C-alpha cells in the first residue's frame, strides 16, 4: 500500500481564502493533523469534517517543549507515525506550506527516507495580503525576513532603501529585540506599520515610530511589521551602486 502525506496550506485568514484543492483535502480526508488550531478558518473546517474522521492538533507540543526546534521535531514525528499506519495523512499549516514553514522541509526529508510520498497543496501566504494592506507591490524590491532572524542580529542585514516586511512578530519581547536591531540602521522616528491579521475581516494596521514598536500589546501569531524604505542614497548598497555607475563605461571618465 502506498503511503502519502499531503501538506496543505490554510492561507493567512478566513476560510474564503482557502484554495479549492485545500478545502477538498481538509474536509474529505480521513486523517488530518493541524499544526495549530489557532487559525481563523479551522473552526469552519472542523465543522465540515465527517464525525467519523480523525483530526489532531499539535498545539499540545508547544507546551511540552521549550525550543521551537524541538516542537517542530515532535510535530514531524507525530505526522510520520500516522503516515506509516494510514494510506494518506493531511497535514495542515498556516499560510503556504513552503513559505516560512519549518516543518515542511523536515517532513519532506523524513518522508523521503521512509519511502512516503509528499504532495504540497498551495495556500495563500501572509506575504501578499500583508503587502497589499500597506499598499506596496513586493516586486518593487520587497524584502521578507523572519523577525526572529533580525532579532538575533546586532545590525540588520537588510537594504534600508527597499521595503521590508518582518514576519511572525508573535510577542512583545520579540518586537523589542527587533526594534533594538533596526535602530542600528533606521532613525528613532522612522514610521513603521504593525500589520495584524492581514487579509482577514479583523485586519488592523497601526503606524507608529520605530522607537515605540514594542509599546503596544498587539502581537500574536498573525502579526507582521512593515518597515518603509529610507530616502534614496542612504545605504552602503546605494553607495556601491553609485561607485559602480561612476566606474562603468558610460560613467565618469575620471573614475574609470
Region annotations inferred by a language model:
Residues 2-8, 24-27, 31, 37, ...:
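Beta-strand/loop-alpha-helix module characteristic of Rossmann-like adenine-cofactor folds
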Residues 1-121:
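Class I S-adenosyl-L-methionine
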Amino acid at each position: 500500500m502506498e503511503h502519502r502525506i499531503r501538506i496543505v496550506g490554510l492561507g493567512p485568514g478566513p476560510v474564503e481564502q482557502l484554495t479549492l484543492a485545500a478545502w477538498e483535502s481538509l474536509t474529505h480526508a480521513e486523517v488530518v493533523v493541524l499544526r495549530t488550531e489557532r487559525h481563523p478558518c479551522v473552526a469552519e473546517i472542523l465543522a465540515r469534517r465527517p464525525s467519523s474522521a480523525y483530526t489532531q492538533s499539535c498545539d499540545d507540543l508547544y507546551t511540552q517543549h521549550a525550543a521551537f526546534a524541538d516542537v517542530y521535531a515532535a510535530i514531524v514525528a507525530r505526522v510520520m507515525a500516522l503516515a506509516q499506519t494510514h494510506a494518506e495523512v493531511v497535514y495542515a499549516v498556516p499560510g503556504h506550506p513552503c513559505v516560512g514553514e519549518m516543518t515542511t522541509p523536515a517532513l519532506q526529508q523524513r518522508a523521503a527516507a521512509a519511502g512516503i510520498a509528499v504532495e504540497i497543496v498551495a495556500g495563500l501566504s501572509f506575504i501578499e495580503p500583508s503587502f497589499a494592506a500597506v499598499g506596496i507591490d513586493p516586486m518593487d524590491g520587497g524584502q521578507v525576513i523572519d523577525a526572529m532572524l533580525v532579532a538575533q542580529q546586532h545590525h540588520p542585514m537588510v537594504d534600508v532603501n527597499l521595503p521590508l516586511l518582518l514576519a511572525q512578530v508573535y510577542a512583545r519581547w520579540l518586537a523589542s529585540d527587533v526594534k533594538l536591531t533596526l535602530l542600528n540602521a533606521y532613525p528613532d522616528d522612522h514610521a513603521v506599520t504593525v500589520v495584524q491579521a492581514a487579509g482577514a475581516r479583523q485586519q488592523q494596521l497601526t503606524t507608529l515610530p520605530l522607537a515605540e514598536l514594542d509599546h503596544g500589546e498587539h502581537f500574536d501569531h498573525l502579526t507582521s511589521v512593515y518597515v518603509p524604505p529610507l530616502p534614496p542614497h542612504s545605504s552602503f548598497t546605494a553607495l556601491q551602486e553609485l561607485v559602480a555607475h561612476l566606474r562603468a563605461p558610460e560613467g565618469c571618465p575620471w573614475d574609470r
